[in-house]
Structure formats: C-alpha cells, structure tokens
Amino acid sequence: MIVLLYVTSLAICASGQPRANQAKGESYSPRYICSIPGLPGPPGPPGANGSPGPHGRIGLPGRDGRDGRKGEKGEKGTAGLKGKTGPLGLAGEKGDQGETGKKGPIGPEGEKGEVGPAGPPGPKGDRGDQGDPGLPGVCRCGSIVLKSAFSVGITTSYPEERLPIIFNKVLFNEGEHYNPATGKFICAFPGIYYFSYDITLANKHLAIGLVHNGQYRIRTFDANTGNHDVASGSTVIYLQPEDEVWLEIFFNDQNGLFSDPGWADSLFSGFLLYVDTDYLDSISEDDEL
C-alpha cells in the first residue's frame, strides 16, 4: 500500500500540465519537478510558551529514603515520674553471707536475772598466814584400835602364770581381809601395810612378783640349782579401801613354787602398820555424833 502511494506521487510530480494563465506562445516548463529532498534548514526561533496544562494525577508514594548518619548524643533528659510498684518477683537463690556489720548501740538494761549455778572451783589460792594456836585436843590414844593381818600357806605346787596364786592354807586372818578363794588381800582401812613372802622352789626356776591393783610392786627371780631353795621378798605400801594385793608368776615356765606339807611350806603374809590419821579423825567425829 505504501509503495503504491509513493509511485502515484511520483507520477503526479512528473506530469507537465500548463498553467491556466500561460500566454500563448510562451514556452511551457513544469513548475514543480519532483527531486531528491534537500538538506534540513537551520532551526527556527523558539516559539512562545504555551499556556500551563492541567494538573496531572497524584503519583504513587516514593520509596523510603536511606537512614541518615547517627546524630550526636543529646543532653540528659529530666527524670520521669515514678512508676507503679511491679508485681512481687520469684524468690532468688540464697546469697553468700555478708560481712559482719558494725556494732549497734547498747540496748536498755534488762531485768535482773536469777542467780546462776555455782561455777567450777577456782585455782588454789596462796597460803594464808598462820593462825592462832587452838585449844588443847583430847587424847583418844588406844580408844580406837583397827586390826588387819594375815599369814597363809599353799598346798599345791607349780601354779599357773599371770594369775593370782591361791594360798588356801590359812594360818592367821585377822579381820578376814584375805580371801583364800581368790588369793587376794582386800584393804579395809587406809594406811601403811607391810607384805612379805617366802617361797620354796624346786625343779624349776622361779619368777614371782607382788601385785598391787594390777601393777607389780616387787619381783623376785631365783634359779633352779637342782636343790630346794627359798625366794623371799617384802615391801611397805600405802593402801586405800578396796585396794587389792596378791602374788603371781610373771614369766612362762618359771613357776617353780614347791609345796610339801610334810616338811616345806611357802608363805604369804601381810599386816597393817598404822591407820591414816585423817581416817581416824573422821571415825572419832562420827562417834561423837
């Protein structure tokens, strides 16, 4: 279609029709001759501004701009109003013990308490000055006589080791303070006592000792010479009531104690030398009461 219109235009331009007012005999030449377009002319002057057009529609909102740089720290604002107390929170874990606080002020004086129990005895004080002589005492010499004595023998040989030797043959027993069933003397009065033993030995060595409340006071050793021999010992001891004294063999296989009622004895004896004077004074006071 476009090509057809272009060809038609060219044909019209090429036609040589004379002008209507052409004089007779005047040569005719076409007024319009189609040719190749010329070069564009220079731009014309700007035209006058047109009247403003109507406002266009409001466009869609643009995208948010980027965040600006962080500004400088502002001044501290005024304190706000105190808020309401929040709900009670859960109990926390127990903290460490704090440091001891400062001593508080002295409180008011309390009421007087009851008398407490007596305290323990204090240390021994210094010795005081000597007092004035007292009134003459009353002699009670011979008014109180306390007796304790025994002497016993044995009828068997070679007793067991480390046990009280049973001296079952009673020769004398003042006050019955020696017990022939146990072989022990039991103290009845506090005071000074004398003890002795004379032991016949034969066929074995002898190791015998005098015992006071489980402790050896004296020990005697005698060797077997093939003949009969006698081992002796004696001592003085202070005894308290219920103290016990006895004889025993203190070494294994050295129990050579020998007895033959027909011609040889082994003896254990003891007696009270004198009673403790404090004990006598306490007895005298009891008698006066």
Curated annotation (Swiss-Prot):
Q: What top-level branch of life does the organism fall under?
A: Eukaryota
Q: Where is the composition biased (Basic and acidic residues)?
A: 63-76, 93-102
Region forming the signal peptide? 1-16
Q: Which Pfam families match?
A: C1q, Collagen
Cellular localization per UniProt: Secreted
Q: According to its record, what are the GO cellular component terms?
A: collagen trimer; extracellular space
Which UniProt keyword terms apply here? Collagen, Secreted, Signal
Where is this protein chiefly located?
Answer: secreted
List the PROSITE patterns hit by this protein, alphabetically.
C1Q
Question: Annotated region Disordered: where?
Answer: 36-134
What residue stretches are annotated with the C1q domain? 143-279
The question of whether Ribosomal protein is a record keyword is answered with: no
Question: Which stretches are tagged as biased composition: Low complexity?
Answer: 48-61, 78-91
Coiled-coil ranges per UniProt: none
Q: Name one GO molecular function term.
A: identical protein binding
The record, for PANTHER family, names: C1Q DOMAIN-CONTAINING PROTEIN, EMILIN ELASTIN MICROFIBRIL INTERFACE-LOCATED PROTEIN ELASTIN MICROFIBRIL INTERFACER
Annotated protein name in UniProt: Complement C1q tumor necrosis factor-related protein 7
Q: By which gene is this protein encoded?
A: C1qtnf7
